[in-house]
């Protein structure tokens, strides 16, 4: 008698419903983000009375709930007001004017040829689709810094901002980024027209991470299928990665799959540690292609120190690198690496030196070393 290789998959495993651990999952409730939810909702509320929404700039470290919070509010708003249409675009994938305009058209069910149309033609197609559908769009540009690096980004945002003025369509824009100074990259004219309200997302505390993970795990796994220490370890690992809840949730998903593949009855700490080895911190993967040689050298030096004062780090850098930079430029690079959630910086008082800054890695040293190989 033939037995299917998938028969064992039908037997009860560890997962009750692993979708609760997927990156795109939006919970019914978002703990510890109540104030940000209220701010975003309040900014979009004018749409309910056919008014113009407040544009938003949302920033904070990776895994602090920026994306899921924005999508949560949009989901609630779409359910409450059928005319509202949320359009989410990840600019890490779509990072040029043409790519974003194509995605906007597609979101309205109006696919355009991938080649052959100029940007202005695609823009006109988008405006036409908005009029036909009679919707009020909220355009969410996640990883907005990836888009703004492109020279056509300012023109794209200017086009979107003028839709209300030229076509009487109330369109809102939400920019999301890890980097505080993202808006400073924009053309002055566009930044002024955008007039975005800034909403900051801070890192989750270890205790908050535990509560978030407990809730996800309760829905994702069978009650007796996960060892009690797993959640604490996942939260501790996320805390090491600057409170990145996404890393912890991805680790639980990967660990559960490892456990099932091994035929284990329970998800254990051993499975979780194996998962950690496979998952590279997202902040590093996203940032590395955009770091210059100076920033990479700073990270190489930091991997040799648990912590170091800023003056000592500058001296170490100057002794290694032929490319001289001023202390101010060096400080700017440290600040950028901190904004990217790779370094942690805190004000400190050192004997003799007086006030200074203490620099530490905000991501696992091993992951940084691995990603810097070959540079």
Model features per residue range: what roles?
Residues 50-73, 93:
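Walker A/P-loop nucleotide-binding motif
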Residues 55-57, 79-93, 197:
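Conserved catalytic segments around the Walker B and adjacent sensor/switch elements
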Residues 258-283:
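Conserved C-terminal helix/linker of AAA+ ATPases
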Residues 276-299:
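Short alpha-helical segments that sit at the start of domains
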Residues 75-85, 109-112:
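Post-Walker A helix-loop "phosphate-sensing" segment adjacent to the P-loop in P-loop NTPases
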């Amino acid at each position: 008698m033939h037995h299917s290789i998938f028969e064992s998959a039908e037997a009860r495993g560890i997962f009750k419903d692993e979708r609760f651990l997927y990156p795109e999952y939006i919970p019914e409730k978002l703990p510890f983000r109540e104030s940000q939810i209220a701010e975003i909702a309040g900014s979009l509320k004018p749409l309910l009375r056919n008014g113009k929404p407040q544009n938003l700039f949302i920033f904070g470290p990776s895994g602090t709930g920026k994306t899921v919070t924005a999508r949560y509010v949009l989901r609630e708003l779409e359910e409450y007001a059928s005319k509202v249409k949320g359009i989410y675009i990840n600019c890490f994938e779509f990072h040029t004017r043409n790519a974003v305009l194509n995605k906007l058209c597609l979101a309205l069910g109006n696919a355009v040829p991938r080649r052959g149309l100029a940007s202005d033609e695609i823009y006109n197609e988008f405006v036409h689709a908005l009029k036909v559908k009679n919707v009020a769009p909220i355009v969410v540009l996640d990883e907005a810094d990836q888009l703004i690096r492109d020279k056509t980004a300012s023109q794209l945002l200017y086009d979107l901002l003028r839709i209300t003025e030229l076509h009487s369509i109330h369109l809102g824009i939400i920019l999301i980024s890890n980097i505080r100074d993202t808006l400073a990259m924009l053309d002055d004219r566009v930044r002024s027209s955008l007039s975005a309200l800034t909403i900051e997302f801070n890192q989750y505390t270890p205790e908050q991470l535990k509560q978030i993970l407990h809730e996800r795990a309760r829905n994702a796994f069978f009650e007796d299928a996960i060892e009690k220490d797993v959640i604490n370890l996942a939260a501790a690992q996320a805390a090491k990665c600057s409170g990145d809840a996404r890393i912890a949730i991805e680790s639980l998903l990967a660990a559960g799959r490892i456990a099932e593949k091994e035929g284990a009855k329970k998800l254990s700490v051993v499975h979780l540690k194996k998962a950690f080895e496979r998952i590279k911190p997202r902040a590093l993967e996203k940032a590395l292609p955009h770091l210059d040689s100076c920033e990479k050298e700073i990270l190489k030096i930091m991997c040799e120190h648990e912590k170091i004062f800023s003056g000592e780090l500058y001296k170490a850098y100057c002794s290694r690198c032929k490319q001289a930079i001023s202390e101010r430029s060096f400080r700017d690079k440290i600040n950028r690496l901190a904004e990217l959630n790779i370094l942690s910086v805190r004000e400190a008082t050192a004997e003799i030196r007086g006030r200074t800054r203490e620099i530490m890695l905000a991501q696992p040293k091993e992951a940084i070393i691995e990603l810097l190989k070959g540079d």
